Swiss-Prot record:
Gene (UniProt): narfl
Quaternary structure (record): Component of the CIA complex.
Annotated protein name in UniProt: Cytosolic Fe-S cluster assembly factor narfl
Family under the similarity heading: Belongs to the NARF family.
Organism: Danio rerio (Zebrafish)
Keyword 4Fe-4S: yes
Amino acid sequence: MAVIFRSISGCITSAESVLITQQSHEELYRVLRHNKQVSSTEQKVVVVSVSPQSRASLAAHYGIGSSEVARKLTSFLKHLGVHHVFDTAFSRSFSLIESQREFLQRFSQREADKKALPMLASACPGWICYAEKTHGEFILPYISTTRSPQQIMGSLVKGYFASQKGVSPQMIYHVTVMPCYDKKLEASRPDFYLSEHETREVDCVITSGEVLKMLEEEKVSLRDVQPAPLDTMFSNVCGEELLGHAGSGSGGYLHHIYKHAAKQLFGVDVDELTYKTMKNKDFQEVTLEKDGQVLLKFAAVYGFRNIQNLVQKLKRGKSPYHFVEVMACPSGCLNGGGQLKPSADQSNKELLQQVEEVYRSEHPSVPEDDSQVAELYQSWLESVGEEKARQLLHTQYHAVEKTANGLSIKW
């Protein structure tokens, strides 16, 4: 248990353990089997949304490119009976745009609201779980309300996609493939349950490792699978290649918010970000200075020891940052607990390096320049910052009282 839930603070409740065990590749198989036994009108539309980090993990394992993994995985999943395979880099574009917008808003309110800054990233569910359980009301106002790419994809699939297809959200079975077990907990949050339709926005989360298990159970090597065309509806596609985002392997939040804020607030065009390593490689700073004055100070803080230091600084009123990209796992999402493990003749460090190389090989796209994203802001959300966008692309957090079983996690 401690290996699986390595990023969560304190204890795992019994209820959370149950929620997680309900989500596995066996559940996906169960739905696919059920679809084959019922009439077409009773079948669920099965959608699988794959994270770029999971693609990179599988690509490093098989020694093939990330976009090739996407095409082959699309083929494999559709052969099993999946109807659509999407890419969460697409929903991440919304997450990055909303995070940029939210940061500018918080920056403008920093004098009136002492907890507007630093804005703390919200895409990591291990970090959110820790914040809610351990620091509650103190820390939550600092955390960005922008949903993670997984949960924005949940909104897209059970909202826009369902309406476009003329299907009730409860007749869609939405699976995500993630680098992290804690994403199963995130999908189970009551905030992401559509009570009107009695369905979750994300029904099941499986890890990169569980996808490998599926391939092994089917006695298939991804190398040997005939590729299929990529679904273009919710994917960042250029020709036959998937596009990624610049910045870290955890989504590039610091990179995109920093460049956007520098331009919008101070008229500064930043080409390259210069990272300064602090106590260790999992704690880095980026500073924008002009005429000797610090205009922006951002940090990337990964792993719980660094996170604990950050929280203590906040509590003492000593944090110098405007924004912090916070991730529970050392080295971030590419090193998530649900990623593939190294082979016998490979170290963790070597594997991580390969995964990072694959991830960075994807051509980066700029979220604001994505015409499909811009079109959806108009047709689905009725433009950036409007009430519908706040409802479907943002969330809230809840301080949790400390009642749990004894599954204590050590970092």
